[in-house]
Structures are given as structure tokens and as C-alpha cells.
Design a protein with these regions (language model features):
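Enzyme catalytic cores with a strong preference for nitrogen-chemistry domains
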Residues: 1-339
Length: 339
């Protein structure tokens, strides 16, 4: 469960500029090496040796800063106008069937004013808290409104059927660019039960509110939104740089949908955003992150936050996303050089 790797601490620091070259693990290695150099410097009795260790430490940090000045990507078209809709639906009401109409109405009311001034409108993970087959009239009406306005909707929704008992945590595209994506990397005990044959007996005993999803295939058709190919991830998938790399080099920008309401008012939603920022930096792509209760944000290819919403408020976060093409060394080679 690689949630808080050491490298994430350097997103806003010079060593973070190594992420496009060696990923989060390479950045973590540089942190450890820096600490070792500093300890050796402070504990060396020979002043000449101290100068040598200081020079090596300075070379590492200045080298990282210099590598960050190299551009590996370039624009792949005009900027897209993006609206991220944060519904702020409380967890106790999210899956309540009696609250479904209220939830859908909230998202529609927040989105309608954005249709005339957006290329893409993004809703969070399972923003539509019902199976796709159960809300097809609503989705069809939303698609008609989107096509008339010339906008794409991207939203999280569970898909599957009770007949087959196969369900997916999914993203659908509604409007000009219909699309479907099934989450590949599921959260253990939250979205599926590991070792089902051995552990199923205690699921009710521990009383964990869980879903029972099936992972999507490793090879899925590339999603499009705003006329550009986009790399998708859902919640926990943003923790894995290897998952983000799957959509490259074709994807010119990234979307991450999440529901961090489970974490409530803890450090975890902010940590999740920090993780997503480093993903954008690793592969040199803008990232639009839509969450139910925050923290929703637009992040540029340098991992910098360009727009950000508050927590625990219904809000629309507006901004521009610049599609980019090109491959960073990390996007090309992955984690293996650092590991």
C-alpha cells in the first residue's frame, strides 16, 4: 500500500524535479542520499573532506534544479476550459436510494451554468450513485443537453448487472465523446475481498461497508474528452505511477476521480492531492482531479496547483488545462531505473 512514499515530501522542493526522470522512488532515493551526505558532512573531522561532501550535496540539489528546467513536453492543441463539480454529498446519504434524486439534481444544478463556458465538465467518483442500467433515462437526458451545448461530461458511476453479479467502478463520457472506463486497480477490503474463499465468512462479522467490484481489463480503449485523448484513474489508482503511464504517449492530459469523504477531516485528502500532483509531474501532463468533498484541483505538468476548491462545500472549480505531447524519461522507462 504505497501511500506515503518518501518522495512525495519533495513535490515543492528542488529534489522533486527528479520525478520526471526517476519517479517518486528516485526522488526518495535522492532524499536518503542527501541525508547521508549531510550526516557525513557534519561528522567529518577533516575540513577538506567536509568541502568535498558539501560539494557533492550541492551538486545533487543544483543538478536536480537544473534538470527541472528541461522541457520534455510541448502543447498539443489549444487549452481546454474545464469545470470540476464538487457535489459535497455526505457519505451517509450518498448510497441512500431515497437521496438519489436529490444528489442528481444537485450535480445538474451546479453544472448547467457551466455548459456554455466549458469544454469538459467533470463529476467525481460514483457521483451518480446507482448502476448505469438503473439511471439510463437520466444519462440519456444529460447526453442530449451536453450535445446541444457542445460540451463533454465525464462522471464516475458503477456499472454492471445484478443478473451476472459483475460490477465495475467506472467512468463514462457523456456528450460529444461517449466513452467507458473500468477501474483496474481496486482497493483491497474496500472494493473487493482478497482471498475470497478464505475470508468471505468474516465480512459480515467485521461489518465493513464494502462493494464487490471486478477489475477492468489492462487494455481498454483510450478515452477522449474535449477532443483530446485523456488518461483516466479512479481514486487509489493515482498512487501507482505505472497505472498513469498506461495511457501514454497518446493521452495529452489526465483526469482523476475520487471520493475522499471516507477520510473526513483528516490529513488523508491533502495527502491524496499531494500524490496526484507528483503523478502529473512524473509524466508531464495537466491533471484535473474531481472529488466528492475535496480536495478538487487542477494541476499543471510541473505539479503546481492552478486552481483548487475548498473542502466540505458544494463548489465548481474552473480553470484551463493545456493538452501536452511528449514523453518524460519516467513516462518512457517507468520505475525500473530507480528500483
Amino acid at each position: 500500500f504505497p501511500w506515503l512514499a518518501l518522495g512525495y515530501s519533495q513535490t515543492d522542493a528542488p529534489l522533486g524535479q527528479l520525478a520526471p526522470y526517476a519517479g517518486v522512488f528516485g526522488v526518495g532515493w535522492a532524499v536518503v542520499f542527501s541525508a547521508g551526505l549531510l550526516w557525513t558532512l557534519l561528522n567529518s573531522a577533516d575540513w577538506r573532506a567536509r568541502l568535498g561532501w558539501l560539494g557533492l550535496l550541492a551538486a545533487l540539489w543544483l543538478g536536480a534544479w537544473g534538470l527541472g528546467r528541461i522541457a520534455w513536453v510541448e502543447p498539443a492543441g489549444p487549452a481546454l476550459r474545464v469545470a470540476i463539480v464538487q457535489g459535497n454529498v455526505t457519505q451517509d446519504r450518498k448510497w441512500n436510494p431515497d437521496a438519489l434524486d436529490e444528489t442528481l439534481t444537485r450535480y445538474v444544478q451546479l453544472s448547467l451554468p457551466e455548459q456554455s463556458q466549458s469544454d469538459v465538465i467533470i463529476w467525481p467518483e460514483t457521483a451518480i450513485p446507482a448502476l448505469l442500467d438503473e439511471v439510463r433515462p437520466f444519462v440519456a437526458a444529460l447526453a442530449g443537453a451536453a450535445q446541444q451545448a457542445g460540451v463533454d461530461y465525464v462522471t464516475g458511476i458503477p456499472t454492471g448487472s445484478w443478473e451476472t453479479s459483475i460490477f465495475h467502478n467506472s467512468i463514462i463520457g457523456v456528450g460529444r465523446s461517449p466513452g467507458l472506463y473500468h477501474k483496474r486497480r481496486l482497493l483491497p477490503f474496500g472494493e473487493y475481498l482478497p482471498l475470497r474463499g478464505l475470508l468471505l465468512f468474516f465480512r459480515d462479522w467485521v461489518d465493513i461497508p464494502m462493494a464487490d467490484f471486478t477489475p477492468g481489463g489492462l487494455e481498454q480503449p483510450l478515452f477522449r474528452a474535449g477532443g483530446q485523448p485523456v488518461g483516466l484513474s479512479i481514486c487509489f489508482e493515482a498512487v501507482f505511477g505505472s497505472e498513469i503511464r498506461r495511457a501514454l504517449p497518446e493521452a495529452t492530459w489526465l483526469i482523476n476521480l475520487s471520493n475522499d469523504a471516507w477520510f473526513k477531516d483528516s490529513a488523508a485528502p491533502h495527502q491524496h492531492l499531494q500524490i496526484a500532483r507528483l503523478r502529473a509531474l512524473e509524466v508531464g501532463r495537466y491533471l484535473a482531479r474531481a472529488t466528492n468533498t475535496g480536495v478538487s484541483a487542477i494541476v499543471d505538468e510541473q505539479g503546481r496547483i492552478k486552481a483548487r476548491g475548498p473542502q466540505f462545500q458544494a463548489e465548481v472549480i474552473r480553470g484551463e488545462v493545456q493538452p501536452l505531447r511528449g514523453l518524460t524519461p519516467y513516462a518512457r522507462f517507468g520505475d525500473w531505473p530507480a528500483v
